[in-house]
Amino acid sequence: IGSVRSARDYYVSLALGHDAIFLHAGGSPGAYTAIDNWGVSAFDCVNGPYEGTLFWRDQQRRKNMGLEHSVLTSGETIQELLPSYSWLRLEHKDGYTYPQTFLEEGQKAQGDSAQSVTITFSTYKTGVFTYDPDSGLYLVSEYGQPYVDGNTGEQVGVKNVLVLRTSVSNLEGDDAGRQAIRTTGTGEGLFFCDGTVQEITWSKEKNSSPLT
């Protein structure tokens, strides 16, 4: 799995709301503050003792793509090593229930036709999701080319695509160009599945609340 990248406070908010264990490689000052203040279970490759165990660096990626794109992990490694950390809670907290409900196997989504979805993130990054009726998945492209699984060489496909509308702004005084992204409150959005789209409303009461 990778490359594992640096944390931002809005990632931490989403992880906390889903009672997740958060793995990252470095992070913004705001992300570290959020991890410390909100009590997120986090493992950091850059400022922690986990490189060479939970994480490792791929030297070929480091040479060809840069240091920040070289950190990897795997599901097998995570499952094997997490129980060895005695301080870590491996079960969901009392009362936690997964907040989102998707279709059961064999059910088909209803809505207006949506065979291709183009999502512009910035002037240089646009995500495209093209519905493939044979697989029932949206095939992912970015930077004008297929987004490929490095293990299989196949184009990545996803069943569900959620587009959430929220406020995004540059952090005042941040020389690195980092952004503030609202993850709490409510907002409108779109849900794409099975080549169809439905309008939705999302909600997240506070940082510790799940996204619904």
Regions found by a protein language model. Give the residues of each.
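A surface/extracellular/periplasmic glyco- and lipid-processing/surface-interacting theme
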Residues: 2-212
